[in-house]
Each structure stands twice: as structure tokens, then as C-alpha cells.
Amino acid sequence: MDLRQLAALTAVAEAGSFSAAARRLHTVQSNVSTHVARLEAELGATLVDRSTGTLTDEGDVVVSRARRIQHELESLRADVDSMLHQVAGDVRLGCI
């Protein structure tokens, strides 16, 4: 399981179709389909009903967890960025 697979599934859930998800991810539909299929194979569950384009119950659970993972990664990046760009030093004020 990798982040690209989770991002592809999340995009399908949000966009409503594989082709719309591909446009959102700036890739081709076959890449999105491959990522989702590999994720399904690894988990041993169908995550998207191909006839309707909707998530299965298992897909809903995976997307919910994937969103949390994506949020945590964004938070991690922000924390590290703020540490790297932290302003430090003395501030001196003078009054007359």
C-alpha cells in the first residue's frame, strides 16, 4: 500500500468517477484504475463498485482512514517547515 494508491482512491471518491479523478490528479484514467486495483488486491476487498462508480462499504472505511493519513502527512510537513524556518534571536526595543 502506498500513498499514490490512497490518493487515487480518495480522488475517485471525491470526483465520482475514475476519469474525473484522473483529471484532478493530472494523470490518465488507466493510472488511477491501476492504483485502485492494486490497493484492492492488497486489501482483498472491492473498494469501488465499477458499475456505479460509488464506494463500497469497505471503500468508505479506507477513504476515511486515507483522509486521516493525508491530513497527518500535511501536518507533519507543516511542523517540519515551521521548525526549519523558525525566526530566532534577540529583540531589543528602545524608548526615548
Give the location of each predicted region.
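A short LG(V/I)-centered, amphipathic sequence patch enriched
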Residues: 40-57
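Residues within the DNA-recognition helix of helix-turn-helix
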Residues: 28-38
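The N-cap/first-turn positions of alpha helices
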Residues: 2-5, 29, 59, 66
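Short helix-boundary/capping micro-motifs
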Residues: 12-26
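Interdomain hinge and pocket-entrance segments immediately C-terminal to HTH DNA-binding domains
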Residues: 81-96
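Alpha-helical linker/hinge and terminal dimerization helices associated
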Residues: 42-43, 62-84
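Short alpha-helical "packing" element that flanks the helix-turn-helix/winged-helix DNA-binding module
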Residues: 5-12, 62
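Alpha-helical residues within the helix-turn-helix
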Residues: 23-24, 41, 60
